[in-house]
Curated annotation (Swiss-Prot):
Residues 56-64, 131-134, 193-195 are periplasmic. GO terms for cellular component: plasma membrane. The chain crosses the membrane at residues 33-55, 65-87, 108-130, 135-157, 170-192. The keyword Cell inner membrane applies. Residues 1-32, 88-107, 158-169 are cytoplasmic. It is a multi-pass membrane protein. The gene is yohC. This is Inner membrane protein YohC.
Length: 195
């Protein structure tokens, strides 16, 4: 959690600090990812059980507490898995670089890069579909920016090569995000029928 403010106020310098640290996966998950991933889960739980999804046409879909809780647990697990998958993707893509970082370092990097996406979950307190999409898009752009800033120093490569690596990673990340969003829509939109 100590890097959250720095990722927004001075991201270039903060990425260099993160790269110099030798944080373990367990420490990173317990002190950053588990807490940050809880933000969208808790906000979505409150928003969908107390206010309900607003589709903009006056239709509101409210979930029961039990359904909301079951879906929140699934949503949380999917987000934690998403960070692990992206860490693995970065590690796999870096296989041909002479200074290949460890899998643990790649997962830590992926967790910090995902911070804007986690924080964008605050908007789920008022689950208006177009507002969630807008805030999520802005968060995705900033996540891409953090990726472009961090990859060159993370892999010790030049900015041109970093741009290529970051673009590939971002493309895979967007694909993973789309899968997560599809699962989220299915779980939060239709999950009440499953539970």
């Amino acid at each position: 959690m100590s890097h959250v403010w720095g990722l927004f106020s001075h991201p270039d310098r903060e990425m260099q600090v993160i790269n110099r640290e030798n944080e373990t996966i367990s420490h990173h998950y317990t002190h950053h990812v588990l807490l940050m991933a809880a933000i969208p889960v808790i906000c979505a739980f409150i928003g969908t059980t107390q206010i309900g999804w607003n589709f903009g046409d006056g239709t509101i879909l409210k979930l029961s507490w039990f359904t909301g809780l079951a879906l929140a647990v699934l949503f949380y697990g999917v987000m934690l898995a998403g960070v692990a998958v992206m860490g693995r993707v970065i590690w796999w893509m870096a296989r041909n670089y002479p200074q290949r970082p460890s899998l643990a370092h790649c997962m830590v990097f992926a967790g910090y890069v995902a911070t804007p996406l986690f924080l964008s979950g605050l908007v789920a307190l008022y689950p208006l579909v177009w507002l969630c999409a807008l805030v999520g898009t802005v968060a995705l752009f900033y996540t891409g920016y953090l990726l472009y800033l961090g990859i060159p120093s993370f892999l010790n490569i030049n900015k041109e090569e970093g741009l290529s690596f970051s673009s590939s990673t971002l493309a895979i990340g967007v694909l993973v995000l789309e899968v997560l969003l599809a699962l989220t829509v299915i779980l939060w939109g239709y999950g009440y029928r499953l539970f």
